[in-house]
Amino acid sequence: MSDLRRKRVKTNPIPDHVPPALVRHFSLFTSPGMAPTPNGDPHAAVACVHDDGPPIFYSPSNTRDGRGTWVITRARDQRRVLEDTETFSSHRSIFASALGEHWPVIPLELDPPAHGVFRALLNPLFSSRRVLALEPTIHARAGALIDCIAKEKTSCDVMKDFALPFTFSVFLSFLGLSQRRSEVLVGWVSDLLHGNAEKRRAAARSVVAFIDEMAAMRRKSPAVDFMTFVVQAKIEGRSLTEEEVRGIGVLFLVAGLDTVAAAIGFDMAYLARNPKHQELLRNEPARLGLAAEELLRAYSTVQIIRVATKDIEFEGVPIREGDYVSCPAMIANRDPSEFKCPNTIDLARQDNQHTAFGYGPHLCHGAHLARREIVIGLREWLARIPAFRIKEGTAPITHGGHVFGISNIILTWA
């Protein structure tokens, strides 16, 4: 399987300024453990970079299109990169490039000062008060899904039956969008993040058409919802352009859905394999807050990439203007210089300064909402479902990539 993936990923030549001693044939897409693997552990597979070799190295193929990147492995170095927006730019137009276009997903792909302007505009949507007001809905969505599962069966595919529909349902409620499109949106997001080039293009077109349709509808018929807020918003005394509305809509429709569902999936798989921890959290749900943070650390899912804006020497490494610089959270959060026994799950770990939601000015806008979804989802599951385990004869399938994921988690409590 991994050999097939290697053939599909193009490798670009190594730039002349990269010292041969800093080249490492490691990739979040093609290294061992990154291809879809039954009972895989991609997080342990990437944690091996801390065992030997330089703390910053050059990977000849570390993006979906086979582009080379510098890989920053230490947590403290990643924080420096993510804080320094002047030297390391976020502007890449990844989503638009799938359509052959060039516009930013907002505010994710903006740099200061524009980033700060748009982030301030959108902050009220993700305030603690607004998330708190949504908590009854989060509990209700989780409870209804789990009750339906428990009523009809003693086994389920937790991703298909719970994690994905739960996270999409909550986020659609958060955005004020109809639940009718949930299954279609799940398919679009899956194709965008994990599909081939053809599927990504088709999904991107569908998402853009959906956002444009919603924006046009809310311009004509305002409501109390996310899209009305966006089309009526003003920055620096002017209304947002159609491209800006689209850039915001794409980010908040796509970002956080697959990643939150994946976090719940990794958590469920861990608890299914560790019955003592499962029972502890079932009997003492007050521990779920710290436990969720530890599982976010251990099973982080996202690689963050920046582009160097100038030639620099960073920790003795010659980074040149235009170089891609990768900050994989799943590597930083297994850094032994940052976390004691990083490959051991400690559900009571204190001062857990992980970067599962990024770091610096681009810290995930929806981090608070995501945390509440994960904790409430686990709480409701443990309260309603008795001791569960991986069904005999089945195996969860994990994969690496730009976003790590897990599927085929067949749980049973018979």
Curated annotation (Swiss-Prot):
GO molecular function: heme binding; iron ion binding; monooxygenase activity; oxidoreductase activity, acting on paired donors, with incorporation or reduction of molecular oxygen
Residue spans crossing the bilayer: none
Group of enzyme by EC: oxidoreductase
The entry's keywords: Heme, Iron, Metal-binding, Monooxygenase, Oxidoreductase, Plasmid
EC number(s) from the headed UniProt entry: 1.14.14.-
Gene3D superfamilies named among the record's database cross-references: Cytochrome P450 (1.10.630.10)
Annotated disulfide bonds: none
Cofactor names: heme
SUPFAM superfamilies: Cytochrome P450
Keyword flag Iron: yes
Source domain of life: Bacteria
Family statement drawn from the similarity comment of this UniProt entry: Belongs to the cytochrome P450 family.
Function summary: Cytochromes P450 are a group of heme-thiolate monooxygenases. They oxidize a variety of structurally unrelated compounds, including steroids, fatty acids, and xenobiotics.
Protein name, UniProt field: Probable cytochrome P450 127A1
UniProt source species: Sinorhizobium fredii (strain NBRC 101917 / NGR234)
